[in-house]
């Protein structure tokens, strides 16, 4: 699963997701892509599940690029713990995704295969997304 090798700080504020994605919203590597339509935190497990689904469907053909990286730690407190005594410990990692962000890219396969593979990956995501292709 994806996670940073090291970070400057163990814990982060939750923050907020305002506006559209101004970076990572264009196809850069492949010909087909899956684009987010809603803001969300996408966990490393969800990213990996989507990647595996695309890889399985595409078999040997084509190349896949994962365009998001989970670099935000999410902390949780143990269950049935009283309030206070500081912030919980980091449990998992998430990628902050805003509308317009490209999640996955694909190349070297036909559009029908890419569309079907991206649909399967989209079903693994907690947000609505759309299939887009590079207009030449």
From Swiss-Prot:
GO CC terms: chloroplast; mitochondrial large ribosomal subunit
Keywords noted in UniProt: Chloroplast, Plastid, Ribonucleoprotein, Ribosomal protein
PROSITE patterns assigned to the protein according to its UniProt record, in alphabetical order: RIBOSOMAL_L16_1 (PS00586), RIBOSOMAL_L16_2 (PS00701)
Entry's Gene Ontology molecular function annotations: rRNA binding; structural constituent of ribosome
Annotated segments matching region Disordered: 1-20
Keyword Plastid applies: yes
Transmembrane segments: none
SUPFAM superfamilies (alphabetical): Ribosomal protein L16p/L10e
Coiled-coil regions, chain positions: none
A Pfam entry, by short name: Ribosomal_L16
Location relative to the cell: Plastid, Chloroplast
InterPro entries, sorted: Ribosomal_uL16, Ribosomal_uL16_bact-type, Ribosomal_uL16_CS, Ribosomal_uL16_dom, Ribosomal_uL16_sf
HAMAP family linked to this entry: Ribosomal_uL16
Stored PANTHER family: 50S/60S RIBOSOMAL PROTEIN L16 (PTHR12220), LARGE RIBOSOMAL SUBUNIT PROTEIN UL16M (PTHR12220:SF13)
NCBIfam families: rplP_bact (TIGR01164)
Protein name, entry field: Large ribosomal subunit protein uL16c
């Amino acid at each position: 699963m994806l996670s940073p090798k090291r970070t400057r700080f163990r814990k982060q504020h939750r923050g907020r997701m305002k506006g559209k994605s101004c970076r990572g919203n264009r196809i850069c590597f492949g010909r087909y892509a899956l684009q987010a339509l809603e803001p969300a935190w996408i966990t490393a497990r969800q990213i990996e599940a989507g990647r595996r689904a695309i890889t399985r469907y595409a078999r040997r053909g084509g190349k896949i690029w994962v365009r998001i990286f989970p670099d935000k730690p999410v902390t949780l407190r143990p269950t049935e713990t009283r309030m206070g005594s500081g912030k919980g410990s980091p449990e998992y990692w998430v990628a902050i995704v805003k509308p317009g962000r490209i999640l996955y890219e694909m190349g070297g396969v036909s559009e029908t295969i890419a569309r079907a593979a991206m649909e399967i990956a989209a079903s693994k995501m907690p947000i609505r997304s759309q299939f887009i292709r590079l207009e030449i």
